[in-house]
Amino acid sequence: MMILGKAGILAQYGTIYVRQNTIRNNLSSCIFKQSLCAFHSLAKVLQQKQVPLDLSYDIIKRDAVKTGDEGKPRPPIIILHGLFGNKLNNRSIGRNLNKKLGRDVYLLDLRNHGSSPHSSVHNYEVMSEDVKHFITKHELNTNGGPIIIGHSMGGKVAMMLVLKNPQLCSMLVCIENAPVSLRPNAEFVEYIKALMEIVNDKGKTIRTLKQADEHLAERIGGNELVRRFLLTALKKVKMDNSSSVSSYTFEERIPLATLKDAIVKGEIAAWPLDPARERWTRPALFIRATQSHYVVDEYLPIIGAFFPRFETRDIDAGHWVNAEKPGECAESIVDFVERHED
């Protein structure tokens, strides 16, 4: 009886012990899960709230004596390039504007392009924050704020910047883009695939710029201007085992996989803002290329909803109008600025 009793008591104690352990384990598991959830929430917040990057840039300084404005600098101009581009693409239009408007012109490399830092995050929110950081850091938000100009992807960055920060800039010029969401551009994905093939060849069959250009021509077509532009996304590296001065292997200058991912996910084609919440009432110019389809007439009411003081200028060129006809682009911008500047 006593043994049975002791066994019963032990069994009861054992049950209590097991239950206590179960409670402890469940509590530990709960605490762990809560900690894990908190960690993921924090990671998500940190991912959403990216630290702005310090962007690479060139500056074309104004000649204060020639322009007659010593001690009274006019609002500067900031120019943003498009996808696959860099600050060098806008040198010609930048020099034109510098000469005709007599002010400093800043040519920026956006994140994951040119000489600017790389990041796994590539969307308009973070890119516009990078540019805002640049303006603030260089104290350009004086005298009414800079004139912001952007082509294609850079145009959406510029639009996002002024809509989110209405007092930051004095004027907007958007070249070949509109505040609309589109389907991801499959053509851009093919561009990246062709460039990655050149990189992955590692000098086996593609050893010169001519051979790289021929590969692009075979893969994406015959537009020489586009091919030349795309090849700036690669850098030549002299082959160690080659006696020929013109034999190279090619490496990525920009993170092609990151940009491909952003294109496929729709980050480049996206437009997340709503004119019911964001509007910009300062002067805005939209330059359209007549041989392109980026800013069709159907988009004009949407542009007007975001930018009620907008106007358009059409130029007979393709999508890369700023490179094809920099002089005509500059003339349109000069006319716009001179009419709207105080």
Swiss-Prot record:
GO terms for molecular function: carboxylic ester hydrolase activity; transferase activity; triacylglycerol lipase activity. It is found in: Mitochondrion. The active site is at S152 (charge relay system), H319 (charge relay system). Residues 39-46 form a propeptide. Residues 75-326 form the AB hydrolase-1 domain. Pfam families: Abhydrolase_1. GO terms for cellular component: mitochondrion. Its main location: mitochondrion. The keyword Transferase applies. It comes from the Eukaryota. Processed by both the mitochondrial processing peptidase (MPP) and the mitochondrial octapeptidyl aminopeptidase (OCT1). Residues 1-38 form a transit peptide. It is an enzyme of class 2 (transferase). Gene3D superfamilies: alpha/beta hydrolase. Keywords: Hydrolase, Mitochondrion, Transferase, Transit peptide. Its EC number is 2.3.1.-. GO terms for biological process: lipid metabolic process. InterPro entries: AB_hydrolase_1, AB_hydrolase_fold. Belongs to the AB hydrolase superfamily. Probable alcohol acetyltransferase that uses acetyl-CoA to synthesize acetate esters from various alcohols. Not involved in the synthesis of ethyl acetate. Present with 7400 molecules/cell in log phase SD medium. This is Probable alcohol acetyltransferase. It comes from Saccharomyces cerevisiae (strain ATCC 204508 / S288c) (Baker's yeast).
